[in-house]
């Protein structure tokens, strides 16, 4: 039977595959005892172990985190993140309980919603492969088998208890991070487990000020090609000058981590600064001179500041005249935070643009026209970085020569060997000039008398 295709055959192949760009604007709070599973007094006794497989939650507001059951320092950090202006869209919270072998909790006096007045606190936790629960009547804990042995009163502080297990529900009490038992050797695997479940985050922070945990997070972060971390540096520590997170990342010349120093407890400058700056396009921002909401400024002396600055640390201070800002915005190695973030973004952009180009072409020839296609795509990626503000615009120097913000060097046929052609390998060199931010101005002038 005759068919129109005999005369006019039309076939359309869809070449619409696009590599997904990385995430460079979302923070993650690594929260031991996150307890974000939404349990309530009416449901916590009937929960099943399989309810707690997830190690993360994604939030668009602090209220959602509170509704899920987050409390104490973990919730304060979430609130600091979302309190910035403009407010960030997304925050990931990772259940970082594996970083503690035992978790300290403290009674808050806040009533357990829906419970009889005699119930002062309730808890649900996972130990091994078993879910356990208990409630506190003001004198003793009671609940599922083994619970009374797992929850031990702290002899050094009334109303505090050490819990042997991963806390997944908690009311009437909050986690006391500084009194919990840190397990720094488990940090890398704990973060990796969260990442394996959900990798759409860029900047890590933690509610724990335990130095061993902070160091382990910094070490893990430095090994990643698309992650950064920000830490609260406890300047009140008597060992700050010799052993602090600021000194650690400085001495190890870390580019992927930075710290903000404070003397104040429950002052989550890390979350506030991340929430303030991650909303901005990489390359368009500086992390210095930023005002922060839901955060307290420190009153450092000039000597204090010079000590912190010498280790490439950062502060949030009141400079008078209504100016309370962060400064100087540097990573452990002394590089500007925004420069490191931009370079990660630019590398990801170019890689994904090249991937998208090649998977949507039947063939790109290993010859001059093919090289031009590749170089044009790389220039397009660099132009995007220039438009974003991370690469300087073209300018004319003092000699009248045009200086380009970026350059892609075209390989010649003679430069490409036969072995490269046979294997399909190609090396293309490029360079660009970073567009740094002005953070300090010295204005020097003269006052003169006319006529002299």
PLM segments and residue spans:
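Surface-exposed assembly/interface segments
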Residues: 1-452
